[in-house]
């Protein structure tokens, strides 16, 4: 049985629980329990703080974990990245007071930078040949320049709204992060096999994101033209209807071109077009 470490609460916990549910893994949540047994897969769930997950996986307290890559990079623990999960996306960036002119990275030479990610920042500055005073603080990093604690900050940025509210602007994106499935190194073959099964389920969900399943009725004589518009993953499914001269066409279409394709199919002569969500897509 695998043991997986996930964030105990917060947005990452919500997204992780949704992923597990979509993968057919039912986990009973309780605020009082740190460990829960799951149904639908041989796995036990360990609830931790996100910054403790890389260490828990590295030490073997958990076999696998779901955590942001920013935490993996900051903790510097030797773990394997199994796959990226497509949620929890953010970037860690350098930001300075809005009114300050910014000539480039050399601006940070001999400056004080406040951050909760000193390891990542120290490595970045070392690679760029910048010497700066890195001041580690646990929270509310964005207020550091305003209270005279630092000249700049290095912190997580999602929309940038928090920076604007605190009179800051982003000047250098240093690290891109998203949630990932990580694993302990040196696991036995049985656990590696279970991880592959878990990865298979997660991949089917991640692969389905950004796609829609589209069904339509179309005159048989127009099928070849319709296939040119939507070639699908390999080829659309074409089924004859009871009405003579008509077919039902089933196809997977990427969301970013969905409406353009549907409009062209409608103009061609398709009728009764249904657009459905995809839960899983297995190549």
Roles of regions detected by a PLM:
Residues 1-42, 67-80, 84-91, 99-283:
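Small-molecule-sensing regulatory modules
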Residues 42-61:
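Short, structured active-site "lid" loops
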